Amino acid sequence: MRRVFLSHEPYVIEYHEDWENIITRLVDMYNEVAEWILKDDTSPTPDKFFKQLSVSLKDKRVCVCGIDPYPRDATGVPFESHNFTKKTIKYIAETVSNITGVRYYKGYNLNNVEGVFPWNYYLSCKIGETKSHALHWKRISKLLLQHITKYVNVLYCLGKTDFANIRSILETPVTTVIGYHPAAREKQFEKDKGFEIVNVLLEINDKPSIRWEQGFSY
């Protein structure tokens, strides 16, 4: 693991070498906006803003991207809920359960699924206020997602409205699926069949499909 230092909290980023190419720019950009972000009590806390940068990208085939961390108790790992109480991850687990036939489980974590990189476009928000830091993260978010798409085969974005224009900011040609948010009404997320579509797209590109059931804990 490599380390780089910041002028503001969290003061240090520990990162995997796969992120090396953009680290200097990330540090410069963050130091410009950090004081505005840190004026608020944040979700997640600053020490968890960059947690996913410790993860390798070379072995990832799919990025599952949400727009924002949970407005309370975010862990720095997108969609993660240690006590399995967050609606978003419960809806994701329910959908995967219906696809795979796994019925009895205690939790679900996309970070445990081989080949999948969970990501949030914005890395923090003010506690209780979703997308409240969107303006501050805008340039950094674009830099990081463009970097991620150089590694993955499929970008699966959760939120039709939030990600309507995402293709316009991507410089790397990447297969992009824009689906409903897991909490969308009338089970639109499940009807979307996004997880199945991702696997079809991988197979078309001669890549192994994702075993979504690996995210379950028992």
UniProtKB/Swiss-Prot annotation:
**Reaction(s) catalysed by this chain's protein:** Hydrolyzes single-stranded DNA or mismatched double-stranded DNA and polynucleotides, releasing free uracil
Q: Which GO terms describe its molecular function?
A: DNA binding; uracil DNA N-glycosylase activity
The active site is formed by 68
What's the top EC group for this one?
hydrolase
Q: In the record, which residues are listed under signal peptide?
A: none
The record's annotation in InterPro entries points to: Ura-DNA_Glyclase_AS, Uracil-DNA_glycosylase-like_sf
UniProt KW keywords: DNA damage, DNA repair, DNA-binding, Hydrolase
Q: Which GO terms describe its biological process?
A: DNA repair
What EC numbers are recorded for this enzyme? 3.2.2.27
Q: List the disulfide bonds.
A: none
Which protein family is named in the record?
Answer: Belongs to the uracil-DNA glycosylase (UDG) superfamily. UNG family.
Q: How does it assemble?
A: Homodimer. Interacts with protein A20. Component of the Uracil-DNA glycosylase(UDG)-A20-polymerase complex; A20 and UDG form a heterodimeric processivity factor that associates with E9 to form the processive polymerase holoenzyme.
Q: What does this protein do?
A: Excises uracil residues from the DNA which can arise as a result of misincorporation of dUMP residues by DNA polymerase or due to deamination of cytosine. Also part of a heterodimeric processivity factor which potentiates the DNA polymerase activity. Binds to DNA.
Q: What is this protein called?
A: Uracil-DNA glycosylase
User: What organism is recorded for this protein?
Assistant: Rabbit fibroma virus (strain Kasza) (RFV)
Lineage, broadest ranks = Viruses, Varidnaviria, Bamfordvirae, Nucleocytoviricota, Pokkesviricetes
